[in-house]
Amino acid sequence: MSDINFMVVDGSLADLVAELTAYIETLGCDELEANCQRALAAGEEPKVFELITQQLPLLNKSSEQQFESVWQLCLHVFSFSESFEWVDAVLKAISGHSNLPRSFNGPAAAGQAVVAVLASLFNMLSSSHDDAQLANTLLAALTTAEETGNLHLLAGQLKSDQTVTWINTWQIEADVRDQLIAKIYSALVQLDEPAKALALLVAAVGNTQTSTFPMTCKLVQQALKSDHVYDFGSILALEPVEDLKTTEQRLFELLTTVASGEVAKMQSLAAGDAKSLIEENDFDAESLLAKTRVIALANLAAESPEIEYSIIAKNLDVSLDTVELWVIDTIRAGLVEGRLSQTKQSFAVHRAQKSGPIAKADWEVISQKLDVWKKSINDVLHVVKQARENANAQKRKIAA
């Protein structure tokens, strides 16, 4: 689950139990070692694991130097168990702010050690195929890391595609899945990975097993707020988002208005019908309008190889002296490439990415371009075929 290394302990179960229980007794438990050895002698291994499980909270009294190694030893002892009933007891004993070991120099150091132990537990459980325990362990690690300022320890895993795979494939309760998605999303935002966070929501909403109405609304809200999202195509293509047309009409209308770059409509919504929606969702009306203008400019550039400043100003409803700034913003958003000419008062378009839903007219334009491309290819093939036939005829003539 993380890049943290963990100690591998070797030896027979009897030796490992003797070492672990002897240490636990020093923390305040009498006769644990003797009771466990008697159970082992009687062939009652489950009894041994039960006895150790009952004393797990004592391990949090370990010194900073011994805490992680003794927990790793404990996990190794449990690896001899045929069941995984002990997992919940481990999570209960080590998780939560109140269970942080007090021997460490502050919560950050203690949290780092706890996350390391939970990472080892997660790796152990990866072969058990118990999705619920894996999810609960990951939740515990995320909670501890967040509370103690150690999210960076899990950054590598959280940023990987494997995290999305877990969420989409684990057979777990819906409320647990929602908690997990919320925790991972929050962690990615705190790790300054807004694009990854949004991709997580897109994947979750796009999966019928994980999609929920609140999550769909959150996806739309975060996409509209994001400084990095200008192409809403993948979001609008999701069926749960399309369903908002009937279940959350105002939010859906706001989404499609911004995504299509409809500046006049956005101005109208911000001043009227959607004013309360914008306030309720903590949207910034000016930011939404700015995003709409950037998308509008990209769509305008996709329709013409060169655009006069006056046309840009009219379509974006901005002053002529700010046109170049809007073009620069659109270039920075990755939607267009081109060259500004102050002399000609125009923008020469080299590349433009049209945003928003694909309308019937867009498909017709695409179809026309494909027809032209197809005709050009056929013309080239005809020329090549004719040249080949002429070459073969010339060879036959020479041979004769």
Curated annotation (Swiss-Prot):
Q: Which UniProt keywords apply?
A: Cytoplasm, Initiation factor, Protein biosynthesis
Give a GO biological-process term.
cytoplasmic translational initiation
Q: Which Pfam families match?
A: PCI (PF01399)
* GO MF terms, alphabetically ordered: translation initiation factor activity
Its main localization is cytoplasm
Q: Per the record's keyword annotation, is Transport included, yes or no?
A: no
GO cellular component terms? eukaryotic 43S preinitiation complex; eukaryotic 48S preinitiation complex; eukaryotic translation initiation factor 3 complex; eukaryotic translation initiation factor 3 complex, eIF3m
Keyword Cytoplasm belongs to the record: yes
| Domain PCI, chain residue ranges per copy | 180-354
The organism's superkingdom is given as: Eukaryota
What subcellular compartments does it reside in? Cytoplasm
Identify its protein family: Belongs to the eIF-3 subunit M family.
Its quaternary structure?
Answer: Component of the eukaryotic translation initiation factor 3 (eIF-3) complex.
Q: What does this protein do?
A: Component of the eukaryotic translation initiation factor 3 (eIF-3) complex, which is involved in protein synthesis of a specialized repertoire of mRNAs and, together with other initiation factors, stimulates binding of mRNA and methionyl-tRNAi to the 40S ribosome. The eIF-3 complex specifically targets and initiates translation of a subset of mRNAs involved in cell proliferation.
Q: What is this protein called?
A: Eukaryotic translation initiation factor 3 subunit M
